[in-house]
Swiss-Prot record:
This is Large ribosomal subunit protein uL24. Belongs to the universal ribosomal protein uL24 family. The keyword Ribosomal protein applies. Keywords: Ribonucleoprotein, Ribosomal protein, RNA-binding, rRNA-binding. It comes from Rickettsia felis (strain ATCC VR-1525 / URRWXCal2) (Rickettsia azadi). GO terms for biological process: translation. Disulfide bonds: none annotated. PROSITE patterns: RIBOSOMAL_L24. GO terms for cellular component: ribonucleoprotein complex; ribosome. InterPro entries: KOW (IPR005824), Rib_uL2_dom2 (IPR014722), Ribosomal_uL24 (IPR003256), Ribosomal_uL24_CS (IPR005825), Ribosomal_uL24_KOW (IPR041988), Translation_prot_SH3-like_sf (IPR008991). Part of the 50S ribosomal subunit. The gene is rplX. NCBIfam families: rplX_bact. Pfam families: KOW (PF00467), ribosomal_L24 (PF17136).
Length: 109
């Protein structure tokens, strides 16, 4: 298991694969598999049988994609960027966009 630099709610863009260029927010992170679910990316249709709890039909849902296929969106420029960690004066650790130096995530809002 590797250290992930992504969190739920981060804005990312797909950089490789059939969904290249699509942007979305991270809905769920699977650290043990190094995968994430991104809203609106890697959509599949699943046929479900009816049961006592719900009726059957076709549902559309997102499947996980590997974290190597995504990149953070720079909050300043809107372009893909790498992420670094930085310590602030108060001692807190934050994620920073390498291209612009802007803080990524809730810490920067």
């Amino acid at each position: 298991m590797i250290k992930l630099k992504v969190k739920k709610g981060d804005e990312v863009v797909v950089i490789t694969g059939k969904h290249k260029g699509k942007k979305g927010k991270i809905l769920k992170v699977f650290p043990e598999d190094s995968k994430v679910i991104v809203s609106g990316v890697n959509l599949v249709k699943k046929h479900t049988k009816p049961n006592q709890m719900s009726e059957g039909g076709i549902i559309t849902k997102e499947l996980p994609i590997h974290i190597s296929n995504i990149a953070h969106i720079d909050p300043k420029t809107g372009n893909p960027t790498k992420v670094a960690f930085k310590f602030l004066e108060d001692g807190s650790k934050v994620r920073v966009a390498k291209k612009s130096g802007e803080i990524i995530g809730k810490e920067g809002k």
